Amino acid sequence: MVSLAEGFGFNTNILETNVLNLAVVLPIVFTLGRDTLTSMLDTRREKILGSLRSADDRFKQAQLELDTAKAELATANDKVKDIKSEGRKTLEALTAEQSSRMAEVATRFAGLKDETIRLEEEKAIAQFRKQLVNVAFEKAIVGIQSQMNASLHRKYIDAKISLMTSRL
């Protein structure tokens, strides 16, 4: 036991404590401790509930942002499909246009080729005619010169002179 000279203290030996002391002290501890413990538990519960509400709000916000992002992704995928489709159509149109242009150019070149061949043939024929005429003239001149004598030459000159005088 604790003597009075030593002051106030707690007896930690359970066998030496008196049941009445415990009956007085324990209700005081439970009464005062209950309010403090209840207050601490209420504060802790409010913090936990606040954290849960905050987490729930953040989850809802994240869910909204996810839904928005999914919608934007779907829109972007649709645009990609549209762009690919337009690209294919444009490529097909350009290919068809290029093919028709190439066919047109080939037709034009074939026409130019035929025209060039025809012109070269005409040029060759004209050159051949010219050479033929020159050869014929040369043969005619040689033939005339070989057959012409002085009296025939004089008759020819007289005929030309009379032709000139009759025009005057």
UniProtKB/Swiss-Prot annotation:
Domain of life: Eukaryota
Pfam families, per the entry: ATP-synt_B (PF00430)
Gene Ontology terms, MF aspect: proton-transporting ATP synthase activity, rotational mechanism
CDD domains with a match to the protein in the record: ATP-synt_Fo_b (cd06503)
Keywords: ATP synthesis, CF(0), Chloroplast, Hydrogen ion transport, Ion transport, Membrane, Plastid, Thylakoid, Transmembrane, Transmembrane helix, Transport
InterPro entries registered for this protein in UniProt: ATP_synth_b/b'su_bac/chlpt (IPR002146)
Gene Ontology CC annotation, any one: chloroplast thylakoid membrane
UniProt subunit comment: F-type ATPases have 2 components, F(1) - the catalytic core - and F(0) - the membrane proton channel. F(1) has five subunits: alpha(3), beta(3), gamma(1), delta(1), epsilon(1). F(0) has four main subunits: a(1), b(1), b'(1) and c(10-14). The alpha and beta chains form an alternating ring which encloses part of the gamma chain. F(1) is attached to F(0) by a central stalk formed by the gamma and epsilon chains, while a peripheral stalk is formed by the delta, b and b' chains.
HAMAP family referenced in this protein's UniProt entry, alphabetically: ATP_synth_b_bprime
Note: In plastids the F-type ATPase is also known as CF(1)CF(0).
Name of protein: ATP synthase subunit b, chloroplastic
